[in-house]
Amino acid sequence: VPTIISEINGNPQIAKMGITQATGAMEGKEQRFGPAASGYWSIVTTIISTGSVNSMHDSSMPLSGMMQLLGMMINAFYGGCGVGILNYFIYIIIAVFISGLMVGRTPEFMGHKVEAREVKIAALVTLLSAFLLKGGTALAAYFVAHHANIEWAVQPANWLNNPAYHGFSEMLYEFTSANANNGSCFEGLGDNNIFWNLSTGIVLLLARFIPIIGPIAIVGLLANKKFIPESAGTLKTDSLTFGLMTFAV
């Protein structure tokens, strides 16, 4: 909803030029879709990891770009659609652990105790995502800032068509998209070169397989533990309270 409203209201910088925007922010959008449908799909596609676009995300309003990034960084909205269900499972394990600490009981999930090993794996998977997208962005920003004219096939100085703040957002979006296995990007970034193809490929591989291995390992550990019957002190994971806790995590 915030994205659709932002796109319908148009670009204030274009409005300052005296240009009428009766149809909303149309830069980078097709007339057959318009700003509302384009804004809506830009969020859906970044949440469910389709990678398809019906508008240029690089031309979206700032709020829209932020929401697109958020959708890929969380990668578990809509109940964890697609591979996001693995991330959602990790969030549940962390939420169960924190909730157990808050009430002073050993955390339990589906009749099995959640202990140190499970939480460590969940924490590593969660931190990996942040490390990959932020580490990759930091590396790219370093080359742009300090080795802009290095003798590569495509010099870092030629990567960015928007060298200011938005250029940084383009690099962040690129690695966020690779980390979320999404496929969309801010196309102001010249990313068809050996650096971006290799770096995002490595990020994609790590972000795809480690979050698969982690939850499977957790399930294996839980399956080997003795089943604990539900009691009065058992944390109910199908309650509104636990839903809010998961959302907070």
Give residue spans per PLM region:
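Membrane-proximal intracellular helices of multi-pass ion channels
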Residues: V1-V249
